[in-house]
Amino acid sequence: MAMNTVFLHLSEEAIKRLNKLRGWRKVSRSAILREAVEQYLERQQFPVRKAKGGRQRGETVVVDDQCKEHKE
């Protein structure tokens, strides 16, 4: 699978916690972040699908306060 680079701004506390987790799991920070993003996206998959057109008339669906637009 082709990979792209993404730059993140994280707090010092988040970096410290990420480094501890890296040590415990013996994997890279990138591997931990990839796994976390994949898990997050998987959890969001159902609400996004529902928001794209599966709603019942008058039903309100909140996907994520950070999700502004979903594109195919």
UniProtKB/Swiss-Prot annotation:
Signal sequence bounds: none
GO biological process: regulation of DNA-templated transcription
Residues covered by region (Disordered): 51-72
GO molecular function, one term: sequence-specific DNA binding
Matching InterPro entries: Arc_rbn_hlx_hlx (IPR013321), CopG (IPR002145)
Pfam families: RHH_1 (PF01402)
Annotated family: Belongs to the YiiE family.
Protein name: Uncharacterized protein YiiE
Source species taxonomy: Bacteria, Pseudomonadati, Pseudomonadota, Gammaproteobacteria, Enterobacterales
Encoding gene (name): yiiE
